[in-house]
């Protein structure tokens, strides 16, 4: 499972021109589910995301986590995070999980993050074309992969 975390001043998701979710200050998290992902990937990523100190403290240092502040979260599924560009110029998405595998794992990530943070998480809509709007804060953008725990 791979996530791209962006610290934002605001973010929203629209489907066919209709806004379906929005947040103010917080994190936009893009989630890509891989064919081999399982519950342990969710558990590791949720713990990492919740404790990641990427918000500024009173001195301006990135020393504060989602658990420490009242920030919003919006999670959006994005299978293209598992694109392979090794051969040719057209990306391959063979490593991305099919919907029957990806949907329960994506929803499991959202549910687990809600439990970890004790707050409602806003989401996109799985499997449809979305318009994601955001204002980056920083910018701060971090990629984390449960299969490559650096």
Question: How should these model regions be labeled?
Answer:
Residues 93:
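Glycine-rich, phosphate-binding/catalytic loops in enzymes
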Residues 1-88, 97, 103-150:
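N-terminal, polar/charged subdomain of small-to-medium soluble alpha/beta proteins
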């Amino acid at each position: 499972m791979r996530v791209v975390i962006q610290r934002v001043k605001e973010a929203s998701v629209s489907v066919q021109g209709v806004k379906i979710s929005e947040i103010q200050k917080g994190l936009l998290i893009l989630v890509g589910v891989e064919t081999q992902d399982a519950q342990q990937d969710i558990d590791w990523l949720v713990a990492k995301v919740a404790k990641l100190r990427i918000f500024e403290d009173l001195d301006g240092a990135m020393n504060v986590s989602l658990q420490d502040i009242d920030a919003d979260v919006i999670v959006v599924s994005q299978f293209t995070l598992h694109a392979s560009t090794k051969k040719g110029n057209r990306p391959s998405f063979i490593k991305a999980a099919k919907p029957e595998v990806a949907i329960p794992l994506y929803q499991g990530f959202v549910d687990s993050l809600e439990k970890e943070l004790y707050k409602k998480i806003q989401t996109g809509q799985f499997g449809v074309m979305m318009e994601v709007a955001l204002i980056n804060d920083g910018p701060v953008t971090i990629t984390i992969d449960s299969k490559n725990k650096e």
